[in-house]
Swiss-Prot record:
InterPro entries linked to this entry: EFG_II, EFG_III, EFG_III/V, EFG_IV, EFG_V, EFG_V-like, EFTu-like_2, G_TR_CS
Family: Belongs to the TRAFAC class translation factor GTPase superfamily. Classic translation factor GTPase family. EF-G/EF-2 subfamily.
UniProt domain tr-type G: residue ranges: 8-290
Cellular location(s): Cytoplasm
Listed PANTHER family: RIBOSOME-RELEASING FACTOR 2, MITOCHONDRIAL (PTHR43261:SF1), TRANSLATION ELONGATION FACTOR G-RELATED (PTHR43261)
GO function terms (MF aspect): GTP binding; GTPase activity; guanosine tetraphosphate binding; translation elongation factor activity
Protein name, as recorded: Elongation factor G
Amino acids binding GTP: 17-24, 88-92, 142-145
Record's function text: Catalyzes the GTP-dependent ribosomal translocation step during translation elongation. During this step, the ribosome changes from the pre-translocational (PRE) to the post-translocational (POST) state as the newly formed A-site-bound peptidyl-tRNA and P-site-bound deacylated tRNA move to the P and E sites, respectively. Catalyzes the coordinated movement of the two tRNA molecules, the mRNA and conformational changes in the ribosome.
Biological processes per GO annotation: ribosome disassembly
Length: 700
């Protein structure tokens, strides 16, 4: 079966935003206008197509990123048919892992901002993730019909907070309840959408007289940005010649794909205005798989290479999401970077070193599915029947093995003990937790060796709450959850030049002998653990050096202060001795572990605690209370901003340990009128009194 859509007509995009910017509603309109949905699903009534988990429909927030395929021929039916694969990503900070893994497989993104709230903290997080994967972007300012909507303020915030280079390709006609439509700065026409047809019909009209001057001014900036794409256009522009509509669009596309500009538009998805033009911009300005660089990868021996987006190349794909479907079982979502794969083909997973046969291939539309026979370069689809693949792993042709770059997932910052309510729950709970951990790499499960309790860890209270809720709904497991615990870390502050570890056992028969000398140094935050082999002259034989490292790495799991994981240390093995008969791997492993523990004691060990970036939006009357409360929680105030229409945003860095139950406290402080967001920022040394309290609690 031949490819239906040429690859240059593909657009793999994400729709990303802060919670409440109206992203899911925007996606719903996209599905409506592209003809997938005949009735618009509203988030308000829990009927949105992309939000298909029960909890998402109840809470009105998007948790998992559903992938959907749609087709678009242009607002005026003026394009050849384009295939748009959309990944809907969550906007809540507890689910940044979902955003991260979808950014990895996208070619472009639409950033949705609220015209009232503007650039909010999660918008900055998503922006950083898009920068990391160099994803070209459009900005869509939504909710232009809301009180306090201000398109130009969002433009200023994008420059200031995101250090972006937004270029307006539209300006709004009116705002708040008077928002009527937009001025298309390329065509220099006003666009009005017909409300009776839910925005499926529109008209081009003359620009209102009062907006003429503003439109000319913003068009001039846009044309100048377009002219900067090449010397040829710049000469034409400086010579006073008019650039054609085609030249402007081609130049804006070139600069968008190069990540030099962010074309900016506006509308109100809820009132059916603007999303149609945003879809046109996706086709006209965002890249196809052919417009982005070939994907970097490695051969089995580590040699760097690339794979082009071409059906003739050998098959390679990246698994970016695992989901359990109630009807077909485990689904692996993947992005095809090169080649073709048919259902029934055998593929190879180089990370696991295993071959697997692909069962069925499915094209997903939110939670509906269509069975397909094959997938091509550029496709995003789901496979059934792969037992071993997990998120971030490569799937490739067994005869042409490559490894695509691995994804790096954040370490959890919060833990809770979870206990089954009944004996039957006990058996099901292990299975349920393992299944959930397989789907979500930022969720970890372990058993506490001392208490025997099951400990779950994740990115925030809401993250864990939703996973426990899924356990109940999807697996029928009732569980009680303990108090949240902070994921502290331990490190050192001093250099220790010479620490000896000697493990000697001389009893009858064969003894044990391992002797090492280490140097320990603190590393800069976030650098992790590093082991350096500086042995000269074979004083520790080559074959025992990995055992020394293994002994140290095992010790890292439990620090000497309160048993928390140890981070950011460099250990250099530079001397030691061995015994011809009694030395073995185990003896050197023990010696490495002993030396490291001793060195930790001598190198000024400290406890590190996770610090959170907290932003509180509050009416001005309560600002003093909010700031006082944050300070009492050991918060460090970072600044304040005004909210249009009154109110303030207070920004602070606060230890996670002080933020449990904050939503209840904030509600009572502000009569329920303030909201907040919080995300992990970095680890910082805990004050002495806090460290002592944590150590005392652990010692009980």
């Amino acid at each position: 079966m031949a490819r239906k859509t040429p690859i240059d007509k593909y657009r793999n995009i994400g729709i990303s935003a802060h919670i409440d910017a109206g992203k899911t509603t925007t996606t719903e309109r996209v599905l409506f206008y592209t003809g997938v949905n005949h009735k618009i699903g509203e988030v308000h009534d829990g009927a949105a197509t992309m939000d298909w988990m029960e909890q998402e429909q109840e809470r009105g927030i998007t948790i998992t990123s559903a992938a959907t395929t749609t087709f678009w021929k242009g607002m005026a039916g003026n394009f050849p048919e384009h295939r748009i694969n959309i990944i809907d990503t969550p906007g809540h900070v507890d689910f940044t892992i979902e955003v991260e893994r979808s950014m990895r497989v996208l070619d472009g993104a639409c950033m949705v901002y609220c015209a009232v709230g503007g650039v909010q903290p999660q918008s900055e997080t998503v922006w950083r993730q898009a920068n990391k994967y160099q994803v070209p972007r459009l900005a869509f300012v939504n909710k232009m019909d809301r009180t306090g909507a201000n398109f130009f303020k969002v433009y200023d915030q994008m420059k200031l907070r995101l250090k972006a280079n937004p270029i307006l390709i539209q300006i709004p006609i009116g705002a708040e309840e008077n928002f009527k439509g937009v001025v298309d700065l390329v065509k220099m026409k006003a666009i009005y959408w017909d409300e009776a047809s839910q925005g499926t019909k529109f008209s081009y009209e003359e620009i209102p007289a009062e907006l003429k001057a503003s439109a000319e001014e913003w068009r001039e900036k846009m044309v100048e940005a377009a002219a900067e794409s090449s010397e040829e256009l710049m000469e034409k522009y400086l010579g006073g010649e008019e650039l054609t509509e085609e030249e402007i669009k081609a130049a804006l596309r070139q600069r968008t794909i190069a990540n030099e500009i962010i074309p900016m538009m506006c509308g109100t998805a809820f009132k059916n205005k603007g999303v149609q033009a945003m879809l046109d911009a996706v086709v006209e300005l965002l890249p196809s798989p052919l417009d982005v660089p070939p994907v970097p990868c490695e051969l089995e021996d580590g040699t760097p290479t690339t794979r082009k987006a071409d059906d003739a190349e050998k098959f390679s794909a990246l698994a970016f999401k695992i989901m359990t479907d109630p009807f077909v079982g485990q689904l692996i979502f993947f992005r095809v970077y090169s080649g073709v794969m048919k259902s029934g083909d055998t593929i190879y997973n180089p990370i696991k070193g295993k071959k697997e046969r692909v069962g069925r291939l499915l094209q997903m539309h939110a939670n509906q599915r269509e069975e397909i026979k094959e997938v091509y370069a550029g496709d995003i689809a789901a496979a059934v029947g792969l037992k071993d693949a997990t998120t971030g792993e490569t799937l490739c042709d067994p005869d042409s093995i490559v490894i695509l770059e691995r994804m790096v997932f954040p370490e959890p910052v919060i833990s809770q003990a979870v206990e089954p309510k009944t004996k039957p729950d006990q058996e099901k709970m292990g299975l349920a937790l393992n299944r959930l951990a397989q789907e979500d790499p930022s969720f970890r499960v372990k058993t506490d060796e001392e208490s025997g309790q099951t400990i779950i860890s994740g990115m925030g209270e809401l993250h864990l709450e939703i996973l426990v809720d899924r356990m109940r709904r999807e697996f029928g497991v009732e569980a009680t959850v303990g108090k949240p615990q902070v994921a502290y870390r331990e490190t050192i502050r001093k250099v220790c030049e010479e620490i000896e570890g000697k493990f000697v056992k001389q009893s009858g028969g064969r003894g044990q002998y391992g002797h090492v000398v280490l140097k320990l140094e603190p590393q800069e935050p976030g650098k992790g653990f590093e082991f350096i082999d500086a042995i000269k002259g074979g004083v520790v034989p080559r074959e025992y050096i990995p055992a020394v490292e293994k002994g140290i790495r095992e010790t890292l799991n439990s620090g000497i202060l309160a048993g928390y994981p140890v981070v950011d240390i460099k250990a250099t093995l530079f001397f030691g001795s061995y015994h011809d008969v009694d030395s073995n791997e185990n003896a050197f492993k023990m010696a490495g572990s002993m030396a490291f523990k001793d060195g930790m004691r001598k190198a000024s060990p400290v406890l590190l605690e996770p610090m959170m970036a907290v932003e509180v939006e509050t009416p001005e009357d309560f600002m003093g209370n909010v700031m006082g409360d944050l300070s009492s929680r050991r918060g460090i105030l970072q600044g304040m901003d005004d909210i249009p229409g009154g109110g303030k945003i207070v920004r602070a860095e606060v230890p996670l340990a002080e933020m449990f139950g904050y939503s209840t406290g904030l509600r009572s402080l502000t009569q329920g009128r303030a909201t907040y967001t919080m995300e992990f920022k970095h680890y910082s040394e805990a004050p002495k009194n806090v460290a002592e309290a944590v150590m005392a609690a652990k010692a009980k």
